[in-house]
């Protein structure tokens, strides 16, 4: 029996895991590399070496999160605070689970992990020591330990010596629940949380993102209750210390646009905003790689090297990668430690208060302008609406762009009612004097997607202040303030009506989209604050 760093089998027995053969505790990258490429491994455990030096893995049938299989134990801790799927008008994935069914699922996972050689990774979620979660991840799969090491904050040796986990994640990807039907669950797979036990269980799905987004959901529960904003956004900081945050759903450009050679990256996906400023929850990045090219996204491309972990990409026999091949999934990914990006905030991923708040949307209708400047009420309206087109493959079964509304640009990860996040964000923005913008990274009347080059020029204009000084005109129906011209952007693109053969074509699509906005926002009109925001939305 080899036990690393003093972690004993007895400690794992406290979670219900018995007869552990071997504990590989906080393995080094070199050890993980050897483990993943072990020729005796079969199936989804096996890694493949690519010519870029990174290992590639296959996550099985689950190439994205499985929101329909997400459950929260409803008990005295959560009954009155959680945003439940079966209450109120808002649609979310927080399905209640009985304590009895939880115990059954826990038994399945602990039996799966018992008698095995286990990887245990202790890591932090949150760069602020006052509010971070100390999380212990337990898995029998080497690459899942690698994913966690990439994505969470890696403790120093000193921090590990005194590490006391306040959340446990047990990943039993190889086990499923045969009794799901009689228990009234969605399928044999499950991703379940217990806030009283402070534990997450995973069964049936190998997708690494369940661990990442699971802890994000927990931060989304704990922080806003303390008045700290918890945000599905990327963030970066300029030379003068000016901080920008980029909200957006998967595939709208959060990672791409915040990874900017002119600015230092704070993080690419999950952040908090407290009295000191903006801080990252993570220690790594999880970038989409479909159609990745060195020319368009050099920072991300260059981050794919030894210690990065590729998911679901096509690897040719000679080890080269076909980034254009989406036959397995459009949601091909790479995780890498944040220091694989040269231009990052060091030594801790945090900075001051944000002054620019950017909402990214990928409008499949081609109605919204590439950029508009929002009023305070429009900021709340568009934050609560969280409109985008769901882009291919970040969830199972979605391959074409379809319009979606996701509260706070991350409804799948919200644990409290959306208005609570809006209230906290607005307070933080007002205190910092921050301005919000709506940026469409999607399509226009030409049927083509707005280019990364044009979007980057728009972001530059926001960040250097030239957009705030530009003359604006108002787009009818949506009442959005659009600049008449911006440096480096074709003026014709700024007004979406110009990209159609006739203004009537835009009008017709705009009416369809406006109606969708109005219908979606109806769920917030049962409170006086929500009803007051209706005027900030589109009008037919």
UniProtKB/Swiss-Prot annotation:
Parts of the chain that traverse the membrane: none
Residue numbers of N6-acetyllysine PTMs: 87, 523
UniProt binding sites for ATP: 213, 232, 248-256, 297, 333, 449-450, 455
Pfam families according to UniProt: PEPCK_ATP (PF01293)
Signal peptide boundaries: none
InterPro entries with a match to the protein in the record: PEP_carboxykinase_ATP (IPR001272), PEP_carboxykinase_C (IPR013035), PEP_carboxykinase_N (IPR008210), PEPCK_ATP_CS (IPR015994)
CC per GO annotation: cytosol
Source organism superkingdom: Bacteria
Details of cofactor binding: Binds 1 Mn(2+) ion per subunit.
Catalyzed reactions per annotation: oxaloacetate + ATP = phosphoenolpyruvate + ADP + CO2
Amino acids binding Mn(2+): 213, 232, 269
Record GO biological process: gluconeogenesis
Keyword annotations from UniProtKB, A to Z: Acetylation, ATP-binding, Cytoplasm, Decarboxylase, Gluconeogenesis, Lyase, Manganese, Metal-binding, Nucleotide-binding
Binding site for substrate: 65, 207, 213, 333
Subcellular location field: Cytoplasm
Subunit annotation: Monomer.
Family indicated by similarity: Belongs to the phosphoenolpyruvate carboxykinase (ATP) family.
Name recorded for this polypeptide: Phosphoenolpyruvate carboxykinase (ATP)
Gene source species: Escherichia coli O6:H1 (strain CFT073 / ATCC 700928 / UPEC)
Protein encoded by which gene: pckA
């Amino acid at each position: 029996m080899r036990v690393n760093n003093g972690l004993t089998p007895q400690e794992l027995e406290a979670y219900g895991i018995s007869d552990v053969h071997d504990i590989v505790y906080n393995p080094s990258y070199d050890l993980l590399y050897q483990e993943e490429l072990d020729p005796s491994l079969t199936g989804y455990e096996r890694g493949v070496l690519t010519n870029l030096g990174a290992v590639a893995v296959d996550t099985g049938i689950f190439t994205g999160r499985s929101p329909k299989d997400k459950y929260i134990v409803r008990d005295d801790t959560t009954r009155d605070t959680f945003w439940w799927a079966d209450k109120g008008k808002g649609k979310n994935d927080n399905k209640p689970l009985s304590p009895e069914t939880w115990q059954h699922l826990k038994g399945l996972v602990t039996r799966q992990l018992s008698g095995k050689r286990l990887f245990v990774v202790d890591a932090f979620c949150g760069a602020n020591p006052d509010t971070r979660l100390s999380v212990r991840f337990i898995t029998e799969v080497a690459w899942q330990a690698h994913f966690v090491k990439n994505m969470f904050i890696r403790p120093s040796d000193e921090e590990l010596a005194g590490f006391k986990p306040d959340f446990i994640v047990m990943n039993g990807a190889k086990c499923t629940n045969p009794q799901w039907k009689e228990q009234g669950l969605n399928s044999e797979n499950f991703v379940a949380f217990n806030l009283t036990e402070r534990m997450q269980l995973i069964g049936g799905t190998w997708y690494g993102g369940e661990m990442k987004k699971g802890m994000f959901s927990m931060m989304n529960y704990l922080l806003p209750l303390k008045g700290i904003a918890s945000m599905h956004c990327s963030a970066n900081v300029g030379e003068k210390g000016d901080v920008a945050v980029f909200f957006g759903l998967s595939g709208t450009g959060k990672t791409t646009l915040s990874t900017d050679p002119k600015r230092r990256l704070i993080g690419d996906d999950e952040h908090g905003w407290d009295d000191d400023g903006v801080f990252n929850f993570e220690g790594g990045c999880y970038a989409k790689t479909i159609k990745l090219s060195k020319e368009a996204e050099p920072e991300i491309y260059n981050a794919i090297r030894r210690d990065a972990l590729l998911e679901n990409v096509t690897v040719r026999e000679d080890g080269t990668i076909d980034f254009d091949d989406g036959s397995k999934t459009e949601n091909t990914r790479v995780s890498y430690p944040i220091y694989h990006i040269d231009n990052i905030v060091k030594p801790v991923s945090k900075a001051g208060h944000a002054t620019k708040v950017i909402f990214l949307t990928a409008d499949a209708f081609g109605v919204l302008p590439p950029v508009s400047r929002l009023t305070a009420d429009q900021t709340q309206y568009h934050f609560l609406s969280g409109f985008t087109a769901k882009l291919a493959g970040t969830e199972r079964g979605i391959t074409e762009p379809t319009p979606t509304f996701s509260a706070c640009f991350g409804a799948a990860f919200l644990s409290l009612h959306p208005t609570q996040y809006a209230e906290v964000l607005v307070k933080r923005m007002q205190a910092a004097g921050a301005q919000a913008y709506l940026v469409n990274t999607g399509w226009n009347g030409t049927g083509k997607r707005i280019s990364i080059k044009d979007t980057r020029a728009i972001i530059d204009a926001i960040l250097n202040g030239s957009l705030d000084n530009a003359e604006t005109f108002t787009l009818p129906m949506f009442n959005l303030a659009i600049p008449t011209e911006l440096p480096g952007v074709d003026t014709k693109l700024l007004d979406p009506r110009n990209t159609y053969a006739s203004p009537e074509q835009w009008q017709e699509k705009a009416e369809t989209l406006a109606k969708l906005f109005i219908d979606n926002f109806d769920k917030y009109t049962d409170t006086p604050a929500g009803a007051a925001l209706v005027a900030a939305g589109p009008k037919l």
